Curated annotation (Swiss-Prot):
It comes from African swine fever virus (isolate Tick/Malawi/Lil 20-1/1983). The keyword Nucleotide-binding does not apply. It comes from the Viruses. This is Uncharacterized protein DP238L. Induction: Expressed in the early phase of the viral replicative cycle.
Length: 249
């Protein structure tokens, strides 16, 4: 098995990469796309098929070869891309059309075509080219917290609405019950009044204070004076007989 020299590997790894300084370490798509550099950067080893023949020396490869351990040692993160910290994506980042942009990092893109009304002004020259607005989602924990707070607020609103609906319903129900009670009492009073009127009609002299004229009119005073005296004598004699009977006992 033939191995490549470390010098050739470093030359092909870092000189053939066409990557801007801003995109270093942001996403794997921004790394070189040839198999050689990918395997060196991520696995620390290369296979025979992935190395082009031009990079291998003729005749001196066996003397100046590197083992796998030496190759891993040479891939130190001093000068290369390995070991670079990955920058956190911003919530909203503006990039021009010419700059390379990976499709996985951007969630929503929108092209804003802004035309200059006054092309002579230097401040508005940057607006000639369209701009891509990259809106990436926030981390998951923030979205969960915001979602939980939204759910709590919605539940509070629903509970408040239910309480208000219940209060209004209870008010309406109480008013309805009060109206029913008033109607029922009014009906009872009317029935009592009707019964009293019926009793008064049947017995017109039951609760009335009767005078002597009324008694004379009720009994019918067609008697003569002699008859009245005889009636009074009979009443007095009957009273005396009753006393005599009681006294005998």
């Amino acid at each position: 098995m033939e191995f490549a020299r470390g010098q050739n590997l470093r030359k092909r790894t870092f000189s053939d990469m066409n990557i801007s300084y801003k995109n270093i370490g942001i996403h794997p798509n921004s790394l070189p796309k040839n198999n050689l550099s990918r395997k060196i950067l991520f696995k620390g080893k290369i296979s025979k098929n992935s190395i082009p023949k031009d990079s291998l020396t003729n005749g001196k490869s066996s003397k100046n070869c590197m083992s796998k351990n030496d190759l891993a040692k040479d891939n130190s993160p001093k000068k290369g891309l390995i070991g670079k910290k990955r920058s956190a994506p911003l919530d909203i980042s503006f990039q021009s059309m010419n700059s390379s942009m990976s499709s996985s990092t951007q969630k929503k893109t929108r092209i804003l075509d802004e035309k200059n009304k006054d092309q002579s002004s230097s401040n508005e020259n940057d607006r000639d080219s369209p701009v891509i607005v990259d809106i990436t989602l926030k981390p998951s924990y923030t979205s969960k917290i915001s979602r939980i707070t939204e759910i709590i607020h919605k539940m509070k609103e629903l509970n408040i609405n239910r309480i208000e609906d219940g209060l209004s319903f209870n008010k309406k129900r109480n008013e309805h019950d009060a109206k029913n009670i008033l109607l029922h009492t009014m009906e009872m009073v009317e029935e009592d009044c009707e019964e009293e009127e019926d009793v008064i009609i049947e017995n017109p002299y039951l609760n009335a204070s009767l005078s002597e004229d009324d008694t004379d009119s009720i009994v019918g005073t067609d008697y003569s004076e002699e008859e009245k005296e005889s009636i009074s004598e009979t009443e007095s004699s009957s009273d005396g007989e009753c006393y005599s009977l009681y006294d005998s006992f």
